[in-house]
């Protein structure tokens, strides 16, 4: 019995090492612009459930890199990765729902996935979710929540979020109107 458990553990470690090696080889090929090789290296580990590889497959299908452009296939790969907690995949699902790429446009789903990603610190998701609160798209308009989210993204030096914070202070939306504070945020964005 112990031998069986030990062998299972060794096989699992071996498979995990292979999956990681495939992912790293695929990532290196992707960074060199060799997308066909990237797909060939990443797909096996994606099919074995590696969330980073699943995200990579989604990215390549979304951009038509090494595979034909296919938003539905990109969505499917992003969903597999997002369900395992990958913040970048969650952000991409939010964007696909927000733009109606690969799925019907659904602002409530966009908000859901942006929020999951934003809670993990993804500044793009924080900004996009903040924009949805600012405009009242998929959520009730809430300038204070928009300011909170923009600030989180701005703290990560996202220039458009810095600019958005300037706009909120200039207009007094969700924060006290303060032209000096607006100027400070605008200068940081420049």
Can you annotate each of these PLM segments?
Residues 8-9, 19:
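Cleavable N-terminal signal peptides
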Residues 15-21:
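Sec/Tat signal peptide C-region and signal peptidase I cleavage site
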Residues 22-29, 41-45, 56-63, 92-99, ...:
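Hydrophobic face of amphipathic alpha-helices that form TPR/SEL1-like repeat modules
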């Amino acid at each position: 019995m112990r031998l069986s458990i030990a062998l299972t553990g060794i096989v699992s470690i071996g498979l995990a090492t292979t999956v990681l090696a495939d992912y790293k080889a695929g990532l290196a090929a992707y960074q060199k612009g060799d997308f066909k090789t990237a797909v060939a290296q990443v797909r096996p580990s994606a099919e074995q459930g590696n969330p980073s590889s699943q995200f990579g497959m989604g990215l390549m299908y979304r951009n038509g890199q090494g595979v034909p452009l296919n938003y539905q296939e990109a969505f499917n790969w992003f969903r597999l990765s997002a369900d395992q907690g990958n913040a970048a995949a969650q952000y991409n699902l939010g964007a696909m729902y927000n733009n109606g790429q690969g799925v019907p446009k659904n602002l409530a789903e966009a908000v859901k996935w942006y929020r999951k990603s934003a809670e993990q610190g993804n500044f793009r998701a924080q900004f996009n979710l903040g924009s949805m609160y600012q405009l009242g798209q998929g959520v009730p308009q809430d300038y204070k929540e928009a300011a909170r989210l923009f600030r989180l993204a701005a703290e990560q030096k996202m220039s458009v979020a810095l600019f958005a914070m300037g706009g909120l202070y200039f207009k007094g939306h969700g924060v006290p109107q303060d032209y000096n504070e607006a100027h400070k945020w605008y200068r940081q964005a420049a």
